[in-house]
């Protein structure tokens, strides 16, 4: 069943007339056309019989025509009301309620005469959760480039270099490999600064005998990677090395349990129990991982409260961590493709 067929099936189930999709990444997912419209209306309308209409600024119409999208295009000028170009009326509309603004919903009510609304968010999340071969290949390439970023960063380490200098070096050098965008702000943290899980790289200078945490990702053909490595610079303290070994054991055991049909919460529990049994449970304050795809954080999460089952075609991260103030912060993260009988690790830089 195609993506559009799954949407129309949901529309029929909800007795809705159409779905209205406005999140740029979701529109891209269904159309193959990517836009950053800012304040302008950019939306995909999918009716219960499968008809598709893309609303976009008139200046983008030619680009849409050159994209994979084969539906109707309504291009509008900034001075026009796009809803008046082809007046429509719907009794019930499914919307992305997690994203659509109140202002935009009022426009739908006024212009389409919508009487009832429902949610399409979960259906789209579940569609994006299972990747096809093309998506997997894009993520695989993004993961290779993330590996290269870690290599670039570790080779640049030297006494006196700052966190920010390492970040800048990674992002400048990776452009030579065709990368134009990172998945998120690159994180490089030295020593106990890494005890802040979402710390901001700054002017801290590297000294001998501490760990360096890299957390980064690359976008390749619209798809993200997201990996973390904590690498030695010299010989860190005994406690810091103990923490590292515990985190590595937790990650290794969690990954080895991955296969289709296993509850996500079971994977989280494996890693969390290892860290807790070692006495560091209070220093592991986040879920074990999350989905990965067009965004660096996607449905589903790998957490103690998620009883949903792993499915073949999912791509998730596994990223246990221990963060002890004034001692060390260690996190190790890999991107994992779930298969019917196990898993494939997509990120490969040494641990």
Swiss-Prot record:
Keywords assigned by UniProt, alphabetized: Hydrolase, Manganese, Metal-binding
The entry's Mn(2+) 2-binding residues are 215, 226, 333
Q: What is its EC number?
A: 3.4.-.-
Query: Which PROSITE patterns does the annotation name?
Result: PROLINE_PEPTIDASE (PS00491)
- Cofactor(s) needed for function: Mn(2+)
Q: How is the cofactor bound?
A: Binds 2 manganese ions per subunit.
Residues the record lists as binding Mn(2+) 1? 226, 290, 319, 333
Please name one Pfam family that this protein belongs to. Creatinase_N
Matching entries from SUPFAM superfamilies are given as: Creatinase/aminopeptidase (SSF55920), Creatinase/prolidase N-terminal domain (SSF53092)
Name one molecular function that GO assigns to this entry: hydrolase activity
What Gene3D superfamilies does this protein map onto? Creatinase/methionine aminopeptidase superfamily, Creatinase/prolidase N-terminal domain
What CDD domains does the record point to? APP-like (cd01092)
Q: Which family does it belong to?
A: Belongs to the peptidase M24B family.
| Listed name of the protein | Uncharacterized peptidase SH1217
Lineage of this protein's species?
Answer: Bacteria, Bacillati, Bacillota, Bacilli, Bacillales
């Amino acid at each position: 069943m195609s993506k559009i067929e799954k949407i129309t099936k949901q529309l029929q189930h909800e007795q809705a007339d159409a779905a209205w999709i406005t999140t740029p990444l979701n529109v891209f997912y269904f159309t193959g056309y990517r836009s950053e419209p800012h304040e302008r209306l950019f939306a995909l309308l999918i009716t219960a019989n499968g008809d598709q209409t893309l609303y976009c600024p008139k200046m983008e119409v030619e680009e849409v025509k050159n994209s994979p999208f084969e539906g109707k295009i309504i291009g509008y000028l900034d001075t026009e009301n796009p809803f008046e170009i082809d007046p429509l009326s719907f009794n019930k509309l499914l919307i992305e309620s997690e994203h659509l603004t109140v202002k935009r919903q009022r426009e739908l009510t006024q212009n389409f005469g919508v009487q009832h609304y429902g949610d399409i968010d979960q259906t789209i999340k579940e569609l994006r959760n299972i990747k096809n071969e093309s998506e997997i290949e894009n993520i695989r390439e993004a993961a290779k480039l993330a590996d290269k970023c870690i290599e670039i960063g570790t080779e640049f380490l030297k006494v006196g270099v700052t966190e920010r200098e390492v970040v800048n070096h990674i992002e400048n050098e990776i452009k030579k490999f065709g990368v134009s965008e990172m998945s998120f702000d690159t994180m490089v943290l030295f020593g106990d600064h890494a005890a802040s899980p979402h710390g901001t790289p700054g002017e801290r200078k590297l000294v001998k005998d501490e760990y360096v945490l890299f957390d980064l990702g690359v976008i390749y053909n619209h798809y993200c990677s997201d990996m973390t490595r904590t690498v030695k610079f010299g010989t860190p303290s005994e406690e810091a090395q103990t923490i590292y070994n515990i985190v590595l054991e937790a990650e290794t055991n969690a990954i080895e349990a991955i296969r289709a049909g296993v509850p996500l919460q079971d994977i989280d529990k494996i890693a969390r129990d290892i860290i807790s049994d070692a006495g560091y449970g209070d220093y592991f304050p986040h879920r074990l991982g999350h989905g990965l795809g067009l965004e660096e954080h996607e449905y589903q999460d790998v957490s103690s409260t998620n009883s949903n089952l792993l499915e073949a075609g999912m791509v998730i991260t596994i990223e246990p961590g221990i963060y002890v103030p004034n001692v060390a912060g260690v996190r190790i993260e890999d991107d994992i493709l779930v298969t019917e009988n196990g898993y494939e690790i997509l990120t490969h830089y040494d641990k």
